[in-house]
Amino acid sequence: MLKTRTAPWRNLFAMMALATGLSAGPAAAAEFVMKFGTATINETQHQFIKMYKEALEKATNGRIEVQIYPASQLGPIPREIEGVQLGSIQGYIGPVDFYVGLDPRYGVFSAPMLFRDDANVAATIHDPAIQAIILGMAAPKRMVGIATLTLGTAAYAAKSAMLRLDDFKGKKLRINGTALERAKMSRLGATGIAMPLSEVAPGLSQGTIDGTISGLSVFVGFKMNNLVRTITVTNDTFLVSLAVVSQAWLDKLPPDLRKAVIDVGQEVQPKAQAWEVDFTKQLADDWVKLGGQVHMLPADDLARMKTLLESVGDEVTKDQPAVHELLLKVREAAKRH
């Protein structure tokens, strides 16, 4: 049953890759090939890699060829990150939540009620002091952070619509897997099930999960309208993405190319972030065109949610000094911007 359901998705992604030339072999002039993966498709992370490819190949005069692998073509998210550490995959971009196994401080960004809106998130993570921390945390894990991006609000959707706050109770909702997410789900009366993006559609089909927390772009990009119809927006949490490259691979490059790989990440970051702002504006309409609806919780439910969730960050991190310290730094930066 699982094989039958998932095969069309794989075929679709393969056809998309072929249609856009993503799986083409390295150009004759390229001295090095950089496989750059992500779990998503046709959204900001995918767009970042496209922009990065164009800029890096130009900056290196074609000495490095960037190959683009969206939609988990290089494996589930944990395997992609592991591949970057080992050097078998040269680049990856994904939500910081998935890096918590390497450094629990990455989980700070999933604290509810931390940011006001998407613009506040962008200003905070691009604050020089905060960005230096985010990028620097990857270094001890044989990865080099090259860019951070926002991906919009983390929205909720389930097979049975969640129109009121009480509708969360009893549901098994897919999360990225941080302790803060689990605590948030518990406060709402739900259960958080950690799961990489590539397993969400099968999980919904088979009943392993009742719903998922994802960006609007995921629901639209993967055309999940055949699995869920109503997306519930609360703006309690926002998604932050981190692009990393392999230190093992960088060590094999001459100094000039090594510098270009890192510098181009910072060059592309503001361009991709600007693209994200425009892209996000159309997502709700795109979902409606697919036959879905976007629902905002009523004001009284949003107020109750804030009361339930605003202490989660401090409560979960209080016994982890390094994690709590970063939470306080991010919170202060968010207030400042």
Model-derived regions, located:
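N-terminal compositionally biased, intrinsically disordered segments and leader/signal-like regions
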Residues: 4-7, 21, 61
